[in-house]
Amino acid sequence: MKRKILIYLKYTFYCVLIIIIVCIGLLFYSGNSVKYNRNYGINSDSLAGEGPYIVYQHDQVRQVYLKGSKAEGYALDEKIVQDSVVEVHVNYYPDQSSFKVQLPIYKHYMPEAAVYPEPEKLLVISDIEGGFAAFRSLLIANGVMNETYGWTFGKGHVALAGDFVDRGYFVTQVLYLIFHLEQQALQAGGKVHYILGNHEIMNMQGDHSYAVGKYAYAATLLGIQQAQLYAGDR
């Protein structure tokens, strides 16, 4: 009886080992293209429509989008900004949705208060990590905004407790949505608080070990270092 059990375990071990080897082989055969994606399985490495990046350079302000494709190559679609407020269009290309942001060209930054009165309602979110689709769904489900990106939280406050960058493929869109909601919340008497997490600080200090490769490519196309994507003049 013991001998039969040992034989059974032996063959089970070899079967499992063969399955593991075949799976690893399939991954390499597919060009290592299988990857975890927090945006519902959408291939989101593309830089098409990425941006806009607002770049202060030589006393000029440039508004830059990236256009093109992996097959044809990428190029910059840019213009010089003359106004003190720029209307930018932010695209989430997997489902072709977009929203507009009125972006002031800041010359001075005012520090935020550290203490606020208790709001009538409060939502705390953290660790979105560039997952735009999940962030959008969470905000809609909790009544913070509607499906057209309009603030619906009244005088409520939303506290963003860090780590909204890194790992995901749509960090730019996430950051613009935060800024968009900050503006709308103020108009309604509400407030969005963005507290830096360790991943925001890592990026600003030049540690991009958790960032996806597309942002290194974006910085190269813009002619800047990756850390400068989040600099005070971007």
Segment roles from a protein language model:
Residues 2-234:
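Feature recognizes metal-dependent phosphohydrolase scaffolds
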